[in-house]
Amino acid sequence: MVQCVRHFVLPRLKKDAGLPFFFPLITHSQPLNRGAFFCPGVRR
């Protein structure tokens, strides 16, 4: 799951520098859907 988040977030961080936005989003969403929101294609 961590690898999925890295593949999804890191490229976006380099483009948008959205760390302040994504970091709290990850911490709040992680216990809810366990990464289903971040990498639905990989989860299937």
UniProtKB/Swiss-Prot annotation:
<dbReference type="InterPro" id="IPR012602">
    <property type="entry name" value="PyrBI_leader"/>
</dbReference>
<dbReference type="GO" id="GO:0019856">
    <property type="term" value="P:pyrimidine nucleobase biosynthetic process"/>
</dbReference>
<keyword id="KW-0428">Leader peptide</keyword>
<dbReference type="GO" id="GO:0006221">
    <property type="term" value="P:pyrimidine nucleotide biosynthetic process"/>
</dbReference>
<dbReference type="Pfam" id="PF08052">
    <property type="entry name" value="PyrBI_leader"/>
</dbReference>
<keyword id="KW-0665">Pyrimidine biosynthesis</keyword>
<protein>
    <recommendedName>
        <fullName>pyr operon leader peptide</fullName>
    </recommendedName>
</protein>
<dbReference type="GO" id="GO:0031555">
    <property type="term" value="P:transcriptional attenuation"/>
</dbReference>
